[in-house]
Amino acid sequence: MAAVSALCFALVSAIAYLFLSSATLHRGDKMKITQLYVYPVKGLRGCALKTAPIGPYGVVGDRTFCLQKVHRDGDGVRYETMLIGYNLQMALFVTSVDYDKGLASVEWKGRGTAFDVAMGITTPDTISFPLKPSTSGCEKLEVNLHTSKASAYDLGDDYSTWFADRLGCEVRLVFIGDGSRPVLGSIAPNSPGGLRRARLSHRVRSLFPFLAYPAERLAFNDIAHFLVVTEESNDQVSSRLEDQCQMDVTKFRPNIVVKGASGAFVEDYWGELAFDGGLKMALTANCYRCQSITVDYDTGATATDDRGMAWKKLNKDRRVDAGAKYSPVFGRYGYCFGSVADKKFRVGQGVAVAHVNAQRTVFDWPHLTTFGTTKK
C-alpha cells in the first residue's frame, strides 16, 4: 500500500510540475502575429492568409505538393526535388489557396522574362487543382528531400505538362497524400533525439503514455512544421542594403511573422512560444538561409541591385549556428505541441516567449550543413 501511495504521489507531483512549468512565461517579448503564409507547392511563392488552419504537418495545405525534375539516362529515370535555392525561376510562380472551395491555384508570371521558354504555349498561365486531389489510379514515386524520403502520388500529365512548359524541363507534380517524411536529427521535439535535449518538463511528460506526444513527421516542408521570423530582424536586414532597397520578408518564406520583439535576432535564443488561445510551439532549430533570399520576383533571377547581396551581407556576421557554419541564420523552425485539430493562427493574435534557451541550438540534420551556399 505504501508503494502504491508513493507511486500515486509521484505521479500527481509530476503532473503538477508539468502544468506549473507550462504556465510560466518568460517575462520578455510580447508580440503579435502580423503576417501568415502558406505554400501549397514547395518552392513556389506563397499565399498570404488572415487565418491559418493548422493540420498535422503545419498550416493546412502547406507544401503538400512538390515538383520532381525528371532525369533520364541509360540507367533509367531519376527524380530530383526542385528547390528554389537552386532554381530561382520558381519565384515566377505565385500560389493561392481557397479553403472554402478546397482549391490551390498557381499563376505563372514569367512572360517576357529570360525564363520565358513558353513562347508559343497557348494554355492559360493560371492552373487550379484540389488541395486534396483524388489519388485513385495515380502512380506512386519516391520523393527524396534532404535525404528524408516519402512515397508520393504523381498527379498525371495535364498538371505536369503545364509546369514543364513553363520551366523548360520535364517535371512531375506530386502530392504527399497519406504519406509523410521522417524528421532527421534531433529537430522534432518529441523524437528520441529531441527529447534528450528538451526541457525537463517535456522529458517528464514523455514518460507517461497518456501524456506523451507522438514523434513529429513532415510533408514536403524542409525541416519543420512552421518557420517563425520577426519584423525587427527583417528591418535590420533592410538596414544593411544600399540605395534604399528594402528586404521583402516573404523571401525568407515564413509561415508566421511576428512584431514586437525586443530587438533584431533575439529569436535566436527562443525555445518556446505561447500564442493567445492556448497554442504552444517549440522552436527547435535555426533556419539557415540559401540563395533564394536574393531573388528578384520580377525576373526570377538574382536581383541586380543590392537586394541581390542580401545573402552575402548576412553571411558576414550571421553564421551563428555551429551546425551550419557556412550559412547565415534567419528565423526559427517550430512545431506545435499536442492536438491542433480545428485550431487556427490569425493575424493580430498575441504571442509571448514562453522559454528562452541559455545558448543557441545547434543544427544537426544529417548531410545538410552546406545546402544553398552556392548556386548549382
Say what each PLM segment does.
Residues M1-K376:
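Metal-cofactor-dependent catalytic cores
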